[in-house]
Amino acid sequence: MIIDDHSRLLVGGELFYNDNACNFQKVLKSAIATYGIPDKLYVDNGCSYSNEQLSMICVSLGVLLLHTKIRDGASKGKVERHFRTLKERWLYTLDISSITSLAQFNTLLKDYMRSYNTTFHRGIDSTPLERYQNSKDHPRKPQSAQWLEECFYNRITRKVRKDSTITIDKVCYDVPMQFISAKVDIRYLPDDMGSAFILFENQKFPIRQTNRNENCHTKRSNTAIDYSKIGGNT
């Protein structure tokens, strides 16, 4: 769950089977697409929020990433209070036996978020949505949908094996043969690996998940390449 500190507006939230960095990035990207780019992002110290990829995403967005102090419950007071509210006003009132899928659960969560955002909040003497809309300091909007996608690309470096493959999260991918034995910069969205590519001299070279049968029958080029130009060793 992502909450706007000033207005208490729920700007992002979704239920997943796993709590991981990829899923948090998905929720954050959706929140920014809808409500804009925050000046600061204040998150927990868990591995889903304290990792190199999120740091690079925030740099691309121009967001200051801050983490709560370890074992300091008071620093997460607003969030913890909201989770208590969510449980008491919504979760505990659900007929769990009638929910048959995660998608249905998330539809109900979205309904709760809309209701919460438009319900009077005594602490701010307004509804969260009204307080957000009346704020003088509105978040920056993304330059474009494509720009926002590019900001959320995960970035890693890999050395290409002699069979023209690399591995990402234990999955093998084919890369263009011209990069064999070179170190390459990879850009990808964890929830859309079909769009992954090598970035070299501002050009994109698509990669694809390896078909082992096809790969073992592929002829490799023996053409000499100056790997120093692409970050590898001669």
Identify the meaning behind each predicted range:
Residues 117-234:
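C-terminal, beta-rich DNA-binding module of retroviral/retroelements integrases
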Residues 55-149, 190:
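Charged alpha-helix within mobile-element recombinases
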Residues 4-5, 199:
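Short, acidic, Ser/Thr-enriched surface-loop or helix-capping motifs
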Residues 9-10:
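Hydrophobic "anchor" residues
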Residues 13-37:
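Active-site beta-loop-alpha junctions of metal-dependent nucleic acid enzymes
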Residues 5, 15-18, 45-47, 63, ...:
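An acidic- and aromatic-residue-enriched active-site/binding cleft used to recognize and process polar
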Residues 34-51, 69-71:
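Acidic/histidine-rich, metal-coordinating catalytic segments
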